[in-house]
């Protein structure tokens, strides 16, 4: 039997008040003003006293733990240390050994954290955020399952705030003869489409640009990026600036002016990609901890996204301000306790089609054979 730590932060507040009815079919689910409830007994756990409630509108009962990200968890105290470890470079089996749990527990909670991160970022973008800075778009190249099926993760980073606004995936062929000999990639909504990823990113960013203003988009001029901007319905509102990647220079040769301009323009994006490769174990060079499922890779990058935006300081040399603080979303750096304080439901937070595809794990990795989908009724 697993024993809980000696000191556990209080998970159940005796003064807790339910904010809405968790029943998605109830009229009080979306309209909290119509929500009326009364206490409906309670139960005891080894972690404390848990009060229960009943909705007057639909009669559904629920508890205070229904509104926690640890809902339905037998060991809720594992969620925060696993979140910390995943963005600190720990692989899943290393975390399992450190926390005395199964590696499957770590995998399931990593997926839960990724879904929570997608909802958290979506809620932040649906708020009062407005993009008034240039946005740098570039692909972080990685892979899942095998290197002959490469995965490009398009990142949209704020040039001055370093805020990571969006991530979008693109599955494509990897380099080399192995990829050419392999079986063709099964068609999926994320395959062979750098331009599709750019269009999905613009769909997410353009509504955040103030009315009458344009979005300054900085790229390296990849043909897929050019096509994505050219074919987007809102291309008139996009000011596309191109800083091409310079040719490789010889050893000892000074950087050209073109290279210096490109590095200065892409600094925020390059830094983001370095942090991903440094902080996530599955993206290190020549690692045996590489991701197995494309959805799993995107879930962990989504967790990195909210950590980078709301928890990590914008600069290590000048700490004190996060990217979210620079945009006015928060007034102080958040901790994992604040980020995991509230359970978010997909029925109450708008998700784009591509992010919902990842949330529900509909993106199948055919090489694996069996892919577990996310089909929960009550838990997330």
Feature annotation, model-predicted:
Residues 1-380:
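Residue-level recognition of single "structural anchor" positions
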């Amino acid at each position: 039997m697993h024993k809980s730590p000696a000191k556990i932060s209080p998970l159940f507040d005796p003064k807790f008040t339910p904010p809405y009815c968790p029943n998605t079919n109830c009229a009080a689910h979306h309209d909290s003003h119509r929500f009326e409830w009364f206490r409906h007994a309670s139960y005891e756990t080894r972690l404390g006293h848990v009060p229960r409630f009943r909705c007057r509108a639909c009669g559904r009962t629920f508890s205070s733990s229904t509104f926690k990200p640890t809902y339905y968890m037998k060991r809720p105290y594992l969620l925060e240390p696993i979140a910390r470890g995943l963005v600190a470079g720990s692989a899943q089996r290393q975390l399992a050994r450190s926390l005395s749990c199964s590696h499957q527990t770590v995998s399931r909670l990593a997926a839960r954290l990724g879904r929570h991160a997608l909802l958290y970022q979506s809620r932040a973008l649906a708020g009062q955020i407005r993009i008034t800075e240039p946005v740098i778009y570039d692909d972080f190249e990685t892979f899942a399952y095998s290197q002959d099926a490469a995965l490009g993760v398009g990142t949209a980073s704020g040039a001055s705030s370093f805020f990571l606004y969006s991530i979008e995936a693109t599955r494509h062929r990897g380099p080399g003869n192995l990829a050419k000999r392999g079986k063709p990639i099964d068609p999926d909504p994320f395959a062979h489409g750098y331009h599709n990823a750019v269009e999905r990113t613009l769909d997410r960013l353009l509504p955040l640009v103030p009315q009458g203003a344009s979005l300054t988009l900085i790229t390296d001029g990849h043909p897929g990026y050019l096509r994505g901007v050219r074919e987007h319905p809102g291309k008139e509102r996009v000011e596309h600036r191109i800083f091409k990647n310079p040719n490789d220079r010889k050893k000892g040769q000074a950087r050209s002016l073109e290279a210096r301009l490109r590095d200065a323009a892409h600094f925020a994006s390059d830094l983001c990609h370095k942090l991903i490769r440094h902080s996530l174990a599955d993206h290190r060079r020549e690692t045996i901890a590489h991701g197995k499922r494309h959805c799993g890779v995107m879930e962990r990058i989504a967790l990195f996204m909210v950590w980078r935006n709301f928890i990590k300081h914008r600069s290590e040399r000048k700490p004190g301000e996060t990217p979210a603080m620079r945009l006015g979303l928060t007034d102080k750096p958040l901790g994992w306790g604040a980020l995991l304080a509230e359970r978010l439901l997909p029925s109450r937070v708008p998700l784009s089609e591509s992010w919902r595809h990842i949330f529900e794990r509909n993106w199948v990795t055919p090489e694996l054979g069996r892919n577990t989908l996310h089909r929960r009724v009550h838990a997330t």
